[in-house]
Amino acid sequence: MSQASARHILVDSEQQCLELKQQIEAGSDFAEVARQHSNCPSGRQGGELGTFGRGQMVKEFDEVVFSGALNEVHGPVKTQFGYHLLEVTSRT
C-alpha cells in the first residue's frame, strides 16, 4: 500500500493561502509559517501530518500527496475544511 508523509497549512481563504505560498517561495520556513498561521492543530508541529496511506485523508489531499512532486509547495488545495498548502516530504 502506498504511503506518504506530508505537512500542510490550513487557512480560511484562497487569498491568504496564496500570500503564505509567496512567503515560503521567497524563503520563509514552511514549518514556521504553519506555526504562525495554520488553523489546524498540526500547525503547532510545523504542519506535520505524519505518515498515512491512500484514502486516509480527503480526496483532494490524496490527489496532490500521491501524485505531486516531493518537497514542493502545492496549493491552494480547497477542501471542506478550507484552503491548504501541502508539501509532500516522502512517498513509498
Identify the residue ranges that each predicted region occupies.
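Well-structured core secondary-structure elements of compact alpha/beta domains
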Residues: 1-26, 41-56, 86-92
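Proteostasis/folding factors centered on peptidyl-prolyl cis-trans isomerases
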Residues: 1-8, 60-92
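Glycine-centered tight-turn and secondary-structure capping sites
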Residues: 26-31, 71
